Amino acid sequence: AVCKGAGAGDVLLANRTPAKAQALADELGCACGTNEEVAGICDFIFLGVKPQMMADMLDELTPTLEARAESRPFVLVTMAAGLSMQQIRQMAGSGYPIIRMMPNTPVALGDGMIQYCSDDVEPEKMAEWLTAMAPAGRLDAVPESLIDAASAVSGCGPAWAYQFIEALADGGVAAGLPRAKAQEYAAQMLLGSARMVLETGKHPGELKDAVCSPGGSTIQGVRLLEERAFRGAVTDAVLAAFEKTKDLGKK
């Protein structure tokens, strides 16, 4: 969503596999180049690699970054789970201005959630970055100490939401609905329910109670989910993801 909202000359893509970079550039209407070219000319350098690959990539880019640091300042933007801003700076070999962000996959449609923190970024550059990111969805500044927890909820959460949609659709099929209809109903229900939470400001428990009529069908489903430890399972999933994210930063 961000790339599609930017001008054709404002985004330069790079990938260790040139064919992938070219295909994505063609899809988004952007230019593509090498990692060194990105490091040499871009104002915001997005580091979109896995944590275990970050050190090697930055080691290759260090000479380019050092050469331009004084004449043309830049901001490093990291999306690597578990790696702190301090770790990224150590890998890059200097205390460059840095933004750490945790997006999720719905940013592709402009309905994502991005938590971010920054260090030593000039206010005008921060404002520029926020404007560029706005088409991706909601943005929220958080202390770096909360980034990993935020990632466990909104970064990993879409996978669990898809599991829930699939499970609801399975139930609908078991009850006689065609698969396509059951999936559509489940997805739209989750979308609308999320909007109810965000736009009404009401507690999810209050909204849940409003659907549960005394002696009705919904409360029976709620009762069964409670018996099967639905809440506990979801909470444990978040904590498991949180612990794994922290482990990534230790390796």
Task: Tell what function each PLM region has.
Residues 3-10, 95-97:
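Conserved S-adenosyl-L-methionine
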Residues 12-18:
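N-terminal Rossmann-fold cofactor-binding loop
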Residues 18, 23, 27-28, 37-114:
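Rossmann-like NAD(P)(H) cofactor-binding subdomain of soluble oxidoreductases
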Residues 31-37, 140-142:
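Short acidic-hydrophobic, aromatic-tinged amphipathic segments that line or gate anion-handling sites
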Residues 87-97, 113-150, 161-199:
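Internal alpha-helical scaffold of NAD(P)-dependent oxidoreductase catalytic cores
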Residues 98-99, 147-152, 204-209:
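Short pre-catalytic strand/loop immediately N-terminal to key active-site residues, enriched for Gly-Thr
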